[in-house]
């Protein structure tokens, strides 16, 4: 401790297994660690944390702001048990109007903003983006096809026929007129919605005056589409151009943070977060820690409105400004429209937490009922449900969904592409054996046996208490065989769910090792619960299978040629029209394409000749 500097920095606490227990930052590392070492005046949470700590690591930073930024990054990477943790860390979707093309398209975008174009958002959910794009298609008739599809069109697609696209691909609209539609869409998404609507209304009136009722109807439908977008946005503030609004509510040992996004004076939606935090932490401490993690990988607006003052608010403001590259104001409004926005978010936080508490209570009763029904030693904390999906053995996949005390845990879902070539097409038993073997081999390798998890009852377990299989005695037998070969058959309870003779819901038969098949009463809540779990696994497996099948269907033969990337593929398809035409082309014809050298032309030619 004597060697620790009196500098700002970040420290990490580790337990005997090498797991990170806590990540913290300090203005003075030496003083902070000395405070821990005194061992008096600490809360129960800190006392437990110190008791489990066997070693610490330190990173010295130049400023406390740097320390705060590094702390947020390390918390998200290692997810320590004693820190406040965001449960849902998905990036937010944006609307992208592409650039660098004669006919820009409108798309949903998530992730790094590396593609050229104009980005609008963030939106609270992919559903909100989808609804907005759908309405903007009707209003501005912008294309949503990929560039490769656009370049190879020889006639308008169905979207043109149903008036969702103006078909710039086949010049049904001039580039100049299409650019006008793009400009209107940008203006609407930039907050100039009223001027765009006024322009469309004037055009509709002019068309009506000229007795051009067909065009007047087009303008009318476009106006209706824009009104539809705004009707789904709820409140649109008059005095707030760009802001994120955070409101926190705590009740029953749980926390809800409601976040609203306002951009260009428009409400782009909201999302409720339920961070994992010790019940001893107050709202100011939880909200402050949440803010630092929230903006670790997300752009920060110029204004952040809070329902209450957070700890180290000035330091957080400085850190957000540093990360964003512009001045950020963090405030707790006391009056006016900004105060109303915060109150609206707070109301939503209370309601969302109330619903979550009710769901959690109901879930606990169902888990206890499941334990009693199937003779489990305790209510399961982790349930895994498995299902397979394929068509005559093709594009076969296995799906695993996970549920626990708080419902479905979607970030734990896993998909398995069936790899084995020894499995007969359509052999569901063989597919299930492969899925279970791959899942539990990795589980044993990464986490060992479930015995060590008892030390950390607050963490979501990696080992399942129960696995549910969509199938009967044969499926359960296949699973038990694999688990037995791995020496872990006594660690997991396997239950098979088979539909009745008529495959009607409510007549399911259940299969367990050492028991006769049995059914549950038709109105049993546990039966409904298991049906919901099975249906979710079925939905996930089918969705995964469809995605794989779709990918297989759109795969282009040019993708198999080394050195042919998106740019060269697009150039070849634009010139020849189809991959089949490329396969028939002579080397001299291929060399006429920009980016195709003689060596590449021969590689393409030889690839198709060798088949």
Curated annotation (Swiss-Prot):
Q: Which InterPro entries match?
A: GIY-YIG_endonuc, GIY-YIG_endonuc_sf, GIY-YIG_UvrC_Cho, Hlx-hairpin-Hlx_DNA-bd_motif, RuvA_2-like, UVR_dom, UVR_dom_sf, UvrABC_protein_C
Decide whether keyword Signal is in the record.
Answer: no
Q: Which GO terms describe its molecular function?
A: DNA binding; excinuclease ABC activity
Stored HAMAP family? UvrC
Q: What does this protein do?
A: The UvrABC repair system catalyzes the recognition and processing of DNA lesions. UvrC both incises the 5' and 3' sides of the lesion. The N-terminal half is responsible for the 3' incision and the C-terminal half is responsible for the 5' incision.
Subunit text: Interacts with UvrB in an incision complex.
Query: What's the protein called, per UniProt?
Result: UvrABC system protein C
The gene name on file is uvrC
């Amino acid at each position: 401790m004597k060697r620790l500097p009196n500098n700002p920095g970040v420290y990490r606490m580790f337990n005997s297994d090498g797991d990170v227990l806590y990540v913290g930052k300090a203005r003075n590392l030496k003083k902070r660690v000395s405070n821990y070492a005194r061992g008096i005046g600490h809360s129960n949470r800190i006392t437990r944390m110190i008791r489990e700590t066997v070693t610490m690591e330190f990173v010295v930073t130049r400023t406390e702001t740097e320390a705060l930024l590094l702390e947020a990054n390390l918390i998200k990477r290692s997810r320590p048990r004693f820190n406040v943790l965001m449960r849902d860390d998905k990036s937010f979707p944006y609307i992208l109007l592409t650039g660098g093309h004669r006919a820009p398209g409108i798309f949903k975008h998530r992730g790094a903003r590396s593609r050229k174009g104009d980005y609008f958002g963030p939106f609270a959910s992919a559903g909100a983006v989808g609804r907005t794009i759908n309405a903007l298609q009707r209003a501005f008739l912008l294309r949503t096809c990929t560039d490769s599809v656009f370049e190879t069109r020889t006639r308008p697609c169905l979207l043109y026929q149903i008036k969702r696209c103006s078909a710039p691909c086949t010049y049904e609209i001039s580039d100049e007129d299409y650019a006008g539609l793009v400009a209107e869409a940008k203006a609407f998404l930039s907050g100039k919605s009223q001027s765009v609507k006024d322009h469309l209304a004037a055009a509709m009136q002019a068309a009506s005056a000229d007795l051009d009722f067909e065009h007047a109807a087009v303008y009318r439908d476009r106006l209706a589409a824009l009104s539809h977008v705004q009707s789904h946005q709820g409140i649109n503030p008059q005095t707030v151009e760009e802001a994120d609004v955070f409101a926190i509510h705590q009740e029953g040992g749980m926390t809800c943070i409601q976040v609203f996004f306002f951009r260009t004076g428009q409400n782009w939606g909201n999302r409720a977060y339920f961070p994992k935090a010790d019940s001893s932490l107050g709202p100011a401490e939880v909200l402050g820690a949440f803010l630092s993690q929230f903006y670790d990988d997300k752009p920060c607006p110029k204004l952040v409105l809070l329902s209450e003052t957070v700890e180290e608010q000035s330091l957080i403001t400085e850190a957000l400004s540093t990360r964003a590259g512009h001045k950020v104001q963090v405030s707790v409004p006391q009056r006016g429209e900004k105060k109303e926005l915060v109150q609206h978010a707070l109301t939503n936080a209370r309601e969302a937490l109330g619903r979550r508490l009710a769901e959690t209570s109901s879930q606990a009763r169902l888990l206890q009922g499941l334990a009693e029904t199937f003779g489990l030693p305790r209510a399961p904390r982790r349930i895994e449900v498995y299902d397979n999906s394929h068509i005559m053995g093709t594009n076969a996949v296995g799906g695993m969904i996970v549920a626990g005390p708080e419902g479905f845990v979607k970030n734990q879902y896993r998909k398995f592409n069936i790899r084995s070539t020894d499995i007969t097409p359509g052999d569901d038993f063989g597919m299930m054996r492969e899925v279970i073997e791959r899942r539990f081999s990795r589980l044993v390798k990464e986490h060992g046996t479930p015995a060590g998890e008892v030390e950390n009852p607050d963490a979501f377990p990696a080992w399942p208490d129960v696995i549910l299989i969509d199938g009967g005695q044969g499926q359960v037998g296949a699973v038990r065989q694999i688990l037995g070969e791995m020496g872990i058959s006594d660690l997991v309870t396997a239950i098979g769910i088979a539909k009745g003779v008529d495959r009607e819901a409510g007549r399911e038969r259940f299969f367990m090792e050492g028991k006769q098949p049995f059914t549950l009463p038709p109105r049993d809540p546990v039966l409904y619960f298991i049906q919901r779990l099975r249906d979710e696994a079925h939905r996930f497996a089918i969705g995964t299978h469809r995605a794989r099948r779709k990918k297989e269907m759109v795969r282009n033969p040019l993708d198999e040629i080394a050195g042919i990337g998106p740019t060269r593929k697009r150039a070849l398809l634009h010139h020849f029209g189809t991959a089949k035409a490329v396969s028939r082309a002579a080397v001299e014809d291929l060399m006429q394409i920009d980016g195709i050298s003689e060596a590449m032309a021969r590689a393409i030619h030889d690839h198709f000749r060798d088949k």
